[in-house]
Amino acid sequence: MEARAVGKYIRISPQKARLVADVVRGMGVDQAITTLRFMPKKGAVILQKVIESALANATQDDQADVDNLYVKVITIDGGPSLKRIRPRAMGRATGIIKRTSHITVVLDEN
């Protein structure tokens, strides 16, 4: 039994979100949430919300045993980028790219 949750258009760069995702991939759900709670990264809070959403989906749909769930798949894909301008000296301007992410979490039973 698999449970999925997707967070789309999240305002964090995929590179920074993948640092956190690599830590919890393959962990049990309880251990992953505890690890993310004490991790001092912006991506940890975001990933924790998506994992908790997948956990809620698992309990809502199939009445799955929460104790046996683990993080089977976490994928961080790039979303659309926001283009901004930063003024510089002598009337110039440089571009800034604010990246977004699509986060997919799949939970499965052992």
UniProtKB/Swiss-Prot annotation:
UniProt-listed GO biological process terms: translation
GO terms under cellular component: cytosolic large ribosomal subunit
GO molecular function: rRNA binding; structural constituent of ribosome
Residue ranges that the Swiss-Prot or TrEMBL entry lists as coiled coil: none
Keyword annotations: Ribonucleoprotein, Ribosomal protein, RNA-binding, rRNA-binding
A Pfam family this chain is assigned to: Ribosomal_L22
Superkingdom, taxonomy of origin: Bacteria
Its job: This protein binds specifically to 23S rRNA; its binding is stimulated by other ribosomal proteins, e.g. L4, L17, and L20. It is important during the early stages of 50S assembly. It makes multiple contacts with different domains of the 23S rRNA in the assembled 50S subunit and ribosome. The globular domain of the protein is located near the polypeptide exit tunnel on the outside of the subunit, while an extended beta-hairpin is found that lines the wall of the exit tunnel in the center of the 70S ribosome.
Subunit structure: Part of the 50S ribosomal subunit.
Protein name (record): Large ribosomal subunit protein uL22
Source organism: Desulfotalea psychrophila (strain LSv54 / DSM 12343)
Taxonomic lineage of the native organism: Bacteria, Pseudomonadati, Thermodesulfobacteriota, Desulfobulbia, Desulfobulbales
Gene: rplV
